[in-house]
Structure formats: structure tokens, C-alpha cells
Amino acid sequence: IFLSAVAVHAVESIPGVTSHYQTVELGDGSRLQAIVAYPDDTSAPLQPLVFTQWVSCGSLEYREGSNAREVLAALARDSGLALVRVERDALDGTGPTCAELDYDTELEHYVQAFARLFDDPRIDASRVFVYGSSLGSTTAPLVAHELEKLGFAIGGVMVQGGGGVTYLERMLNFERNYLERRPESVAAAAIPDEMLLRTRFQYEYLVAGRHPDDIAGDGPEMARIRADILGMGESDQYGRPYAWHQQAARHNFLAAWAAIDAPVLVIFNEFDQYEIRHGHKLIVDTVNRARPGTATFVERPNIGHSDNRFATLEDAYAGREGTPTWQETAVILTRWLNEQT
């Protein structure tokens, strides 16, 4: 169901690109704003490139100077596909805001919204491409697999900044990087015991589904860990409800990757502050075992999670003096898409 195509704030302006705003209504009554962007000179429907975004909330509209949004703008302009984005905040109180949204509902909203947007006359849904960035790398294979089950042919899936390990492993990698990459604050000899404590906390939180405050009540060590978990606030982690992360921990990302019948591109940035190489390579190895030669692995030296180049791993973790490399990322993604189309 498409409603009035009116933006409630400034419409994005990408040179050489037309951005069409519309509202899509979902089965639970939520109304989400969507943006379909394509080159100005487009005269025929284009196959869609749907985007699944990172964990943090915020609009997906183009904003000059944001590495991630510059990449999206380049894809809209140069990929030969229609870039399809869906904002996660429900409009006018019709559903949850992004900060209230849990993982399973976010996933369902993506699938429903994209499927309905494929009826747009600007879109040729004969093949669908999916791009996931950061934690969107976990929703990307799940969305692609669900769209396949609805009968849509997946032309390719691209991810950067997220691997195929379990969510528990992912968050433990966050913790290990947090300890290892701050040598001025954490002694190497203290890391093994600290990781055991953090593993206990993360298991209770993500797998057992306990509230962080309840875990903190188990004793002073757990209380100390609770106060020092990355991104964890009084009622959220990285701006999302605890339930978002606990539901993510119940999903089998690797099974989705193995099931998708499509080419796959995985980009790993060597100095990623959160993710590790193994998780990215695991996707490629799993897909290539199931469908030999269909998955591509690209490793980019000296680059961090958010597409900046740094001199050292420690500089990357501290965010010191990074140089944007989004143009390089856009070229890698666009070339790969052109090879598939």
C-alpha cells in the first residue's frame, strides 16, 4: 500500500540521481518512509538494490561527508540498479521507533517493505540485489533468504563489516578487541581472565536472555563487567533494546548464507574495530563449499570499520587521524555488481 509521497523533512540531493520518496504500510499497521534512488537519465525500470543498515538509529538519507552514505550515493548513481532504502522509524506513531524496534520485527519490516516496494513501476523485480553494512551484514542474508522464499530471484548479496559467526561470538570478538587494542589501559596478562568474565556475562545476556542488571546482581565482578560492556546503557545497547541483541543471538546466519542461491561478495577491512577476519572468511568458505566459485572475498589493508585508513591497528581503534576511503569501497561494490548484471 503506497501513501502520499511527501517527505517530512528536507529531501536528499545526490548529484546525478533522482530520489523518490514514498510511504509503505506494513501488516502490523506501521508506516515506513522509503527512498528509491536511480540515475537522472533512467528511462526504464531498474532491478533493485535493497540496503540493510547498521545497528545505530538515524536516517538513511544522503548526507555529504558520511562515508557510508557517500557509498550509497555512488551505488545509486553508478551501479545500474535502483537503490531502495527503508527508514526504520515508523511514521506518526503507527509503530515502533528505531530505538524501540526489536531484531525480529526489524527483519520482518524489511522483508514486507521491500516486497511491496517491488511493485513500484520504477523497479524491475526480476532479480533483487542485497547490500548489508556493519550489523546489516547479519540481516542481509536473512532478508535475502526470506525474499527468495517469497519467490524473488536474488541476483547477489554484498556485505561489509559483519561475518557469519554466531551473534555471541561476534560480541565476544568486540570484547577481545576492546581489551587487546588498548595496551595503554589493559595489560596483556590480564586479558585471559577478563575474557572469561566477559564470556560469562555475554552468555547470560545473549543466550540465557537475562537483563544486564540481573546479571550484575550475581556479584561484584559481573557488576563491574556490566558497567564496562561496549555500548551498553541503562536500558539499551548501541541505542537498541536489549531484546534486539538477544533475538539476534537466536538467529543462524550461516544457515541463511548456505541457503541463498546467489553470488556473494564479502569485504573485510583489516583494521575493523569490531569484526574479525574469520567471520568474514567463514561466509565465503561456506558459500563456496555449497556453490563453488560463487563467493568473493576482498581484504582491504589498514582500513577500519567505517571506511577510514589508519597507520596502525591501535590508531584505528582510537579513531586517530583516519583518511576516508569510501571511493575505493564504492568502486569495489559497483564493479562486482556490474559483473553480476
Language model segments and positions:
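Short, surface-exposed "cap/lid" segments of acyl-processing enzymes
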Residues: 41-75
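Alpha/beta-hydrolase active-site loop
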Residues: 100-120
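Short beta-strand/loop motif that positions the catalytic acidic residue
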Residues: 260, 266-268
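Conserved alpha/beta-hydrolase "acid-adjacent" motif
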Residues: 273-281
